[in-house]
Design a protein with these regions (language model features):
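Macrodomain-like recognition of ADP-ribose-binding/processing modules
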Residues: 1-165
Length: 165
């Protein structure tokens, strides 16, 4: 069940937050930076994973913090070419594959609610009108609340009450 909300995704009560990055992302801009600042150990764990696994666009990486919060990184963007390079742009193909993987993960791990931004539209460079149908296709039939933070308002708790399962 998809629900569009307005607010600060970092204040979400959802069981997991999903966001788009590149496979070798530095988490130094956009939502990724905010997540890195809120959960520094997540970024350290991502760095370790990225060096061990060589992730590819279209995949996902999930992290669970000490307090039970989950962050799921969707590899929607091309990796940077060299060490220290900025991530490439997102593609609809990568977004689709990552959302499909996310959908399977949510079911397998029994995630009870999910929050995500307008995926791949900031740093990723895609238009929401093109990404939204993919979100609907891959997440619309999940039997959990899927909160899409369509408008960011810093420090504002979104009204998630209409999204109860």
């Amino acid at each position: 069940m998809l629900h569009e909300v307005t607010g600060d995704i970092l204040l979400s009560k959802a069981n997991a937050i999903a966001h788009g990055v590149s496979p070798n992302d530095h988490f130094n801009q956009g939502l990724a930076l905010s997540l890195r600042e809120q959960w520094p150990s997540m970024y350290k764990d991502f760095r370790h994973f990225e060096k061990q696994a060589t992730p590819a666009p279209g995949g996902i990486w999930a992290w669970m913090g000490y307090g039970g919060q989950r962050v799921i990184s969707l590899f929607t963007q091309e990796p940077g070419i060299g060490h220290g390079d900025h991530a490439g742009k997102a593609s609809l193909s990568h977004v689709g594959h990552a959302l499909k993987a996310l959908s399977h993960f949510v079911v397998e791990e029994r995630i009870s609610s999910l929050a995500l931004p307008r995926l791949a539209t900031g740093v990723g460079g895609l238009a929401w009108k093109d990404v939204h149908p993919l979100v609907t296709q891959h997440l619309g039939n999940l039997e959990i609340p899927v909160l899409i933070y369509t408008t960011y308002v810093k420090s504002k708790q979104a009204d998630e009450s209409t999204a109860s399962a």
